[in-house]
A protein has these predicted regions:
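Domain-length accessory/inserted modules outside core catalytic folds
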Residues: 1-128, 132-208
Length: 208
């Protein structure tokens, strides 16, 4: 298993607060930021960022989920076709392999670096909505044993999930801010994944 002590989130409180001042608060009926499993029903994800976030939340608590129909654990009314199932299986394999990588090479599914910053911020909020949804649906609760750092990270994710970002301008400073926020989310995910998931290096991470 990777040494997750390297994955302590960097101090990005000021960056998070900066983005929380931008745009309006988004409130999604399906992905309302709550860890309650009561919010586990819906028609499916609205974007690849949201889908990947939900998968990450699932894998943090159910690393033995089926690689071919893992989405059924999250979305009761989500009915992908055969081609989409292949894509979902590939996403599962790529995600769990990246989360178990010694190189910490997991990458968030976001618009390209040269896309408008507002669209990247919005995708970040969707990814965070998905992560919280996946964690809550998969069993995370107030009773789950987590470190103080992980609890703080989850609180930050809930806050970020409510960002709209429509007022963000395309400046170098804000581009640097969003890159720092992305890194914070990456490392924070490794932190909670390392605390919650039971996989070892000898476990086959794709055969389910």
């Amino acid at each position: 298993m990777p040494n997750y002590s390297r994955a302590r989130p960097i101090g990005s409180t000021s960056i998070i607060n900066f983005f929380l001042t931008l745009g309006s608060i988004i409130m999604s009926e399906l992905y309302f930021p709550s860890l309650s499993p009561a919010n586990s029903e819906g028609d499916g994800p609205t974007s690849i960022a949201e889908l990947q976030g939900a998968l990450c939340g699932l894998l943090c608590l159910q690393a033995d989920a089926s690689r071919t129909d893992w989405y059924k654990n999250l979305f009761e009314d989500f009915s992908p076709d055969e081609e989409e199932i292949l894509d979902l299986t590939a996403l599962f394999d790529q995600t769990i392999q990246s989360l178990n990588s010694l190189d910490f090479d997991f990458q968030l599914e976001l618009p390209a670096d040269d896309a408008p910053i507002a669209s990247r911020v919005y995708a970040l909020s969707q990814w965070c909505q998905g992560l919280i949804f996946g964690l809550g649906t998969s069993g995370l609760s107030d009773e789950t044993d987590l470190s103080a750092d992980s609890k703080e990270f989850i609180e930050d994710v809930i806050n970020i999930s409510q960002i709209d970002g429509s007022d963000v301008e395309n400046t170098e400073e804000e581009q640097a801010n969003i890159e720092e926020l992305i890194e914070y989310l990456r490392m924070g995910l490794f932190l909670i994944f390392g605390e919650l998931q039971p996989l070892t290096p000898d476990t086959d991470i794709t055969e389910h």
